[in-house]
Each structure stands twice: as structure tokens, then as C-alpha cells.
């Protein structure tokens, strides 16, 4: 058994900072439960002082999660730290993660504080955090561009104040692996009391090296890695949890560490986060992409058929892909459906959700002869979103399209409990459907992105549509899936409108 590597997931905090990736409290709870099943050690549930909505979500997650540590971020000031402390109070295990910038450019231009003032603020924040919990993490923002002597000083002081985990973020994704490993080795050696705490890496992907730098930090002595599902995060994203976990698992000979993550829950977690945030996973994404275990070359196919390990360093099943791609049919019953969901790592929160998902499955089975695992993931995720959000819900859609004539869309949907009818022409069937919705709603939102992804192969495949809308500075992603791509598009548009409505409700409650 090697050293323990702690996996700190920040999908719900740093990941949510991706444009349009905002989540409701219920969605955050659902993802937190999946992260707990995955076996992550620490779930950073949000930034308690940022908004009442964030505080409520952290508090609810702290009440729900029993096995993982629930953490809140806090700037190094009393208001933030106390908000974090109150938010995590119900947690079986709670952590406060406080931070302040330490690079010369950040201290001078952003904080306008002297190094001594920064040290004092950090020490005070850690001491206040210890009033709430014995588990306190301190981060030196922009650490990889900070003076190492100053870092050793501030880290030494916060250790004396009670910090138990020290995080060294590459905030702007500037680091390179060789220097990262050396930096960690030197910093740990030079920090007074550095052998008494857990050292952590938090790397961003601006130069495409977040995972490589995180692994280099492990070689340099880090025993916690901060990461997100699918590498989600602002700008180019964060270190990808699935890549970090499988790298240390597959190359234990190099890294000599073990995590407690259940790798078979990786794909279910990836699919859930993708659906909730509206961020599709690129097909060639390591571990969780649709092509991650596909072999096109004849030579590769021949080798894999003879012995899988000729071209596969891990099995698809080991990370949660199902070995049996073809699943249920129209004659399958509710128990078979429930059993298959369990095999796929899909857990529904209630009998109501299971019944609704099974009804949707039966509808899909009437349209599609072969139903694959990917269909079930899309169907169940879509149903969970529908149960939660009833402000806008599609009832029916009819589109008439004739060569040389503009398509005409007639739509019926529920708006705030009332059935609405809309009709419009457009430059194409999707445009007509969107305009028919807007004729009724008049949201004033701008369409920023429209993308379509085939969930499985063949002409019967469900199409998964992502729609990104923006309004008054807010950006949201909506998703919809159906065998009819126009219907999927309408679902995605209404899903995005629902997210805008949820954000407005949360803002109104915060202002009240």
C-alpha cells in the first residue's frame, strides 16, 4: 500500500465558474451524492459568502453527505470565514478553505497590501476558521508565481495558526511539470512544520498541462490534488479528476500513491455533470470520451481481439463503461430497467423519479428498436431535470417544412402552469421552433451556442442538443435529448429558459 492521495473535488465551486455552468441547489446535491459514491475525499461545495444561494447549497450538501468531507471556500477575512463556518456546521466532516494571493503582482495590483499585511490576514483567517473546525486548508493564490521565500514564511505562520492542509495553486496555468515538481520539493523542505501537514496542488489548464502539473506535484510531495469532473472550470478548465485518478492508479509504479476513489463510478459522474451543466464531453477525451476505448485501425483491432492488453492499458469496464452496449427493449419490465440503471451506476432519488424515467423509457422504446446505455443515461438525466423544473415544459411540437418555403413551427408548452401555444416561421425548422417559443415568452435572451451530438450510432439515434442563452450578463446552458432533433432542440431551449428563471428567483430571494 502506497501513500494516501486525497482527492479534492471542486466541480461544484471552481467547475461552476465555467460560463453557463451554473447549477441549482438540487442539482448540486445530486452531483454531491454522486461524488460521494465516487469516493472523493473532499467535496468543495461552494463559496458560502458569495451569495445566499451558495450558502444554502453548501448547508444542504453538508446535511446530506456523510462519507466525504464537505468544504466551503472563503477569502481571508472574518466575514467570509464565518459564513463558511456556519454553512458547514451540519456536516459530519467539515472543512474551511481560506485563501489570499501571495504573488507580487496580486499583492500590489489587486490586494494593495504589503507582504506583512497578507501574512497577518492569513493567520487571522486560519485562527477564526479553527473556531469552527479542526480541518482548515489555506491556499496561497497564484503560488507558482510567488517568491518561494515568502511562501515558506506565510505557510509556516499558518501552520502555527492551525492550518492542516496547504494548497499551492497554479492559478493562471503558467507552470510546467519539471519545475512544478522541483518547486514542491523545495517549498516543503523550506517551510517550518512542512512535514506536519498535507500539501495540495490546484492546477489550471491554460497551457494544457493541468493534469501533468498535478502529477508532477505528487512526485514532488503533494498528497492532495484539487480537480474537477471532466476538467470543468473557468477559462481552459481545471485538472481532470478522472485523468489524475487513473494516472496514479495505472502508473502506481511511478507515483507510489493510492486513492480511495471507486473508478467504476467515473463515467456515471462524468455523464451527470455533463448533463447538468450542459457541457458535452469531447469524444476523444481521455477516460470518459465516447472514443476513449474505440479502435479504428485494423492492426489495433486485430490486436485487441486477440488480447485486449495489446492496445488497452485499462479496461473500459474499470472506469464505468458497460461491457454490454446493447441493453433493453420495448418488452423489458420495470425491474429489468431498475437493475440496468443500477449496473450503470445511475441512482434515482425517489420512486416518483423511477416511475417517470420508466415511462420515458417505454416511449423511447416505441420509437427506437435498439436502446443503448448512452440512451439510458440521456433519458434518465433529462427526466431528472424535467421533474425539478416545471416553469417551462414541452407538450407538443409540429413543424411543416417544404422545399423552397420557410418552415412553420407550431408549439404547445407549459409556462408557469399554464398551457401556451406559439407559431412562427423561420430560416430553418430549429429557428422556427425557437421563434415560436419566443413569441410567447419574450425572454429577450440571446442565443450564444447551438450544438448537436448523436448519442449513439445509426439513424434511430437520439440527438442531444445543447443551447446556450445569455441575458443581462447571465449565461446558461440547456440540454434536451430526443430521436427527433427538432424536438430535442425545443427541449434544450426550454431547459435554458428554466435555468434563467431559477437564477432570477435566487437573485430575487437574495435581494429580499
Swiss-Prot record:
EC number(s) per entry: 2.3.3.13
Cellular compartment(s): Cytoplasm
Cofactor: Mn(2+)
Signal peptide region: none
Enzyme's top EC category: transferase
This protein's record includes keyword Manganese: yes
Classification via Gene3D superfamilies: 1.10.238.260, 3.30.160.270, Aldolase class I
Annotated region described as Regulatory domain, given as residue ranges: 393-512
Pfam families noted in UniProt: HCS_D2, HMGL-like, LeuA_dimer
PROSITE patterns: AIPM_HOMOCIT_SYNTH_1, AIPM_HOMOCIT_SYNTH_2, PYR_CT
Molecular function in Gene Ontology: 2-isopropylmalate synthase activity; acetyl-CoA C-acetyltransferase activity; manganese ion binding
InterPro entries the record matches: 2-IPM_HCS-like, 2-isopropylmalate_synth_dimer, AIPM/Hcit_synth_CS, Aldolase_TIM, LeuA/HCS_post-cat, LeuA_allosteric_dom_sf, LeuA_bact_synth, PYR_CT
GO biological process: L-leucine biosynthetic process
Disulphide-bonded residues: none
Functional description taken from the UniProt entry: Catalyzes the condensation of the acetyl group of acetyl-CoA with 3-methyl-2-oxobutanoate (2-ketoisovalerate) to form 3-carboxy-3-hydroxy-4-methylpentanoate (2-isopropylmalate).
Protein's name according to its UniProt entry: 2-isopropylmalate synthase
Species this protein is from: Chromobacterium violaceum (strain ATCC 12472 / DSM 30191 / JCM 1249 / CCUG 213 / NBRC 12614 / NCIMB 9131 / NCTC 9757 / MK)
Lineage: Bacteria, Pseudomonadati, Pseudomonadota, Betaproteobacteria, Neisseriales
Amino acid at each position: 500500500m502506497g501513500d494516501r492521495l486525497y482527492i479534492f473535488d471542486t466541480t461544484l465551486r471552481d467547475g461552476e465558474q465555467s460560463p453557463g455552468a451554473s447549477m441549482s441547489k438540487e442539482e448540486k446535491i445530486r452531483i454531491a451524492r454522486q461524488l460521494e459514491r465516487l469516493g472523493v475525499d473532499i467535496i468543495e461545495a461552494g463559496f458560502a459568502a458569495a451569495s445566499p444561494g451558495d450558502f444554502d447549497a453548501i448547508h444542504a450538501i453538508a446535511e446530506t453527505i456523510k462519507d466525504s468531507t464537505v468544504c466551503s471556500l472563503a477569502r481571508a477575512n472574518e466575514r467570509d470565514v464565518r459564513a463558511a463556518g456556519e454553512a458547514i456546521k451540519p456536516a459530519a466532516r467539515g472543512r474551511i478553505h481560506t485563501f489570499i494571493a501571495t504573488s507580487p503582482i496580486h499583492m500590489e495590483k489587486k490586494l494593495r497590501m504589503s507582504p506583512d499585511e497578507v501574512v497577518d490576514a492569513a493567520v487571522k483567517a486560519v485562527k477564526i476558521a479553527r473556531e469552527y473546525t479542526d480541518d482548515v486548508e489555506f491556499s496561497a493564490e497564484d503560488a507558482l508565481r510567488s517568491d518561494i521565500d515568502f511562501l515558506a514564511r506565510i505557510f509556516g505562520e499558518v501552520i502555527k495558526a492551525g492550518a492542516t492542509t496547504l494548497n499551492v495553486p497554479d492559478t493562471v496555468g503558467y507552470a510546467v511539470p519539471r519545475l512544478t515538481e522541483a518547486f514542491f520539493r523545495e517549498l516543503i523542505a523550506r517551510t517550518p512544520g512542512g512535514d506536519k501537514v498535507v500539501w495540495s496542488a490546484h492546477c489550471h489548464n491554460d497551457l494544457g498541462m493541468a493534469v501533468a502539473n498535478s502529477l508532477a506535484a505528487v512526485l514532488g510531495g503533494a498528497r492532495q490534488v484539487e480537480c474537477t469532473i471532466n476538467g470543468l472550470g473557468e477559462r481552459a478548465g481545471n485538472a481532470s479528476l478522472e485523468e489524475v485518478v487513473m494516472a496514479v492508479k495505472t502508473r502506481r509504479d511511478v507515483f507510489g500513491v493510492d486513492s480511495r476513489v471507486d473508478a467504476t463510478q467515473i463515467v456515471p459522474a462524468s455523464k451527470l455533470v455533463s448533463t447538468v451543466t450542459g457541457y458535452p464531453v469531447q469524444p476523444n477525451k481521455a477516460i470518459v470520451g465516447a472514443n476513449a476505448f474505440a479502435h479504428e485501425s485494423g492492426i489495433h483491432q486485430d490486436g485487441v481481439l486477440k488480447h485486449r492488453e495489446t492496445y488497452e492499458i485499462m479496461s473500459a469496464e474499470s472506469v464505468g463503461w458497460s461491457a454490454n452496449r446493447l441493453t433493453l427493449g420495448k418488452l423489458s419490465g420495470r425491474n429489468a430497467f431498475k437493475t440496468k440503471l443500477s449496473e450503470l451506476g445511475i441512482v434515482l432519488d425517489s420512486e416518483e423519479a423511477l416511475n417517470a424515467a420508466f415511462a420515458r423509457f417505454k416511449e423511447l422504446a416505441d420509437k427506437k428498436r435498439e436502446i443503448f446505455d448512452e440512451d439510458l443515461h440521456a433519458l434518465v438525466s433529462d427526466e431528472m431535470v424535467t421533474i425539478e423544473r416545471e416553469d417551462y415544459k414541452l407538450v407538443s411540437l409540429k413543424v411543416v417544412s417544404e422545399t423552397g418555403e420557410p418552415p412553420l413551427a407550431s408549439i404547445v408548452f407549459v409556462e408557469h402552469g399554464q398551457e401556451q401555444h406559439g407559431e412562427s416561421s423561420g430560416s430553418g425548422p430549429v429557428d422556427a421552433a425557437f421563434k415560436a417559443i419566443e413569441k410567447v415568452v419574450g425572454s429577450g435572451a440571446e442565443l450564444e451556442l447551438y450544438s448537436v451530438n448523436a448519442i449513439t450510432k445509426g439513424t434511430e439515434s437520439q440527438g442531444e442538443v445543447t443551447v446556450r442563452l445569455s441575458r443581462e450578463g447571465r449565461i446558461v446552458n440547456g440540454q434536451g435529448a430526443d430521436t427527433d432533433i427538432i424536438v430535442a432542440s425545443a427541449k434544450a431551449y426550454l431547459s435554458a429558459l428554466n435555468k434563467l428563471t431559477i437564477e432570477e428567483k435566487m437573485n430575487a430571494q437574495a435581494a429580499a
